Amino acid sequence: MKNEHNKNLDRRDFLKVLGGAAAVTSATLLPGCKNKQESAYTATTDIPTDQMTYRINPSTQDRVSLLGYGCMRWPTVSNNSARDSNDDIDQETVNKLVDVAIAHGVNYFDTSPAYCKGRSERATGIALNRYPRDKYFIATKLSNFAPSTWSREASIAMYHNSFKELQVNYIDYLLLHGVGMGNGLQEFNARYIDNGVLDFLLAERQAGRIRNLGFSYHGDIK
């Protein structure tokens, strides 16, 4: 696909290019710990571990949990949210939260280079790397919101860093983050089209380093 064609993508063409695998990001569906005595992971014995609902991804046949775990607000050592606090992430608690999620059938974890002030991918990767790679699905994003990250080089560097932080050699679901935000189509083109980044990601998908390529959307549906 040539960049010249990309500049004229409409919504239908865009969805076709992504192969119908446009993904919706999960909310943070399991709570962080309120305090050391009232931890989310103490509920392990109270919740059935065999009643998760799954959906089959028609493109890959992945059996994905209907409930996903959003990793935007990992807890800190001071029991705050790492989204708002610069305190260290409480990795021990993150590990236990992930353990509870997996024990109860959750296998889809959604993160981003932007979450937790840039620390979510690393904490998520540490927690998940304790499990066999085929036991979970990682969704992360190309979160190149700032104009300083719009160049091809900066965007690709962000993409490669996600592999390092997550400790993986492929990403299950890679999302173009927050399309529709900012200055609409003009900003979208600057982030993904004019710089050739979408073409690069399509090649990465072809090579198997991205299993599903999609986007998250926070704008007006019209």
Feature names for model-found ranges:
Residues 30-68, 81:
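C-terminal segment of N-terminal export signals and the immediately downstream linker at the start
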